[in-house]
Amino acid sequence: MASSSNEKEINYLADETNVRILGRTYFHNNILWMIYLSSGIEFNISANKLYISIKGDSAANVESSEGQISLARIIVNVNGERKLDELILHQDQTFKIFDEQNIIEGVVQVIKISEVAHSIAGIKSITVNSNGKISPTQPKQHRIEFIGDSITCGYGIEDLNPLNKFTTKTEDCTKAYAYKTATALNADFNLVSISGWGVISGFTPDPNVKNEIKLIPKYYIKLGFCNNSFEGKCVQDIDWNFEKFVPDVIVINLGTNDNSYCNGDKTKIEEFVNEYTKFLNVVKDKNPNAYIFCSLGIMGDQLYSGIENAVKKYKEANKVENISLVHFDTQLEEDGIAANKHPSEKTNEKAAKKLIEEIKNKMKW
């Protein structure tokens, strides 16, 4: 429903009456909070004017983006063309998307393209002229969930200098393999990915020191994990409702960060295999009808044999066949290396091509 109106404009809430919800989000106090990457809204529009009002999280209180590495980054696409690309600096910001003499018709998409751990942002309202209209778009043909780390996030993908470090300014999930795969397959999708996270250990510079905080399995059943709060709430304290998104396919791309800890140690690798198998059981429990693809390789495939063993154990224990492996090619310097030695968009295009073929083959899409 519309939240308010007058002679000149109508303000709509970002709820399911007016828009289609994308990704893991949370509606609270009439604000739709965009949690993981690529979460947000999509809607049909017929209007002369469009403004989007955004609410920042607890860290959105800066005068400039200079020196900031964790600000939420949002984009607005109109008929597939990026019309807005902004970092959220303040608690309340309103952005003009267009204000024209002629009516604009088509599809609008508002999504967050930076990752949850660093920041989230909320959609307060969608404003159009008094005779403007919006409505939810139709769901896509298929549904995919991607579970991963920085590679899935599009970490540093806009910065082709491998010596540079992380900032949300150069992170863009729309240029990474997961987004490209889902788009090519006409699929709605959820991204459950955080940079530096793993199965038994997040990234660690010292293989003798286990990073037990940054574990995807620990927070998979939660809304997410964020260092900031929103309206006095913490993302990691809220359970995710798995009925909100029921995927046909789940792609898991974890193990790159675990390798920094395992470092070829057989005992550690055995622990990785066991915990990966346990996580597969959790994923199956929450998504009983999904086909699972377990992948690795873009930034190294040292734990690929461990994932093979985990999949074998999972299949034997559950007497199922709806799971398979995808061995990605390791990135090449000639394709460009992005910030902090992460894959370029060209590398992601190659990975997407391979994954698309695998999914089409198994799912007959």
Please place each PLM-identified region on the residue numbering:
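Conserved SGNH/GDSL esterase-like catalytic core that processes O-acyl groups on lipids
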Residues: Y36, L163-K266, I298-E308, H342
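N-terminal secretory targeting modules
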Residues: M1-I147, I151-C173
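Structural recognition of the beta-strand scaffold that forms the well-ordered cores
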Residues: R143-I147, T152, F189-S193, D248-N253, ...
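A structural motif corresponding to the C-terminal end of an alpha-helix
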Residues: A178-D188, V282-Y291, Y314-V320
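Short, conserved loop/helix-junction motifs that constitute active-site signature segments
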Residues: P139, F245, K284-N287
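Aromatic/hydrophobic pocket-lining residues that form the small-molecule binding cavity
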Residues: F272, Y276, N348
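Catalytic His-Asp segment of secreted/periplasmic serine-dependent ester chemistry enzymes
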Residues: I298-W365
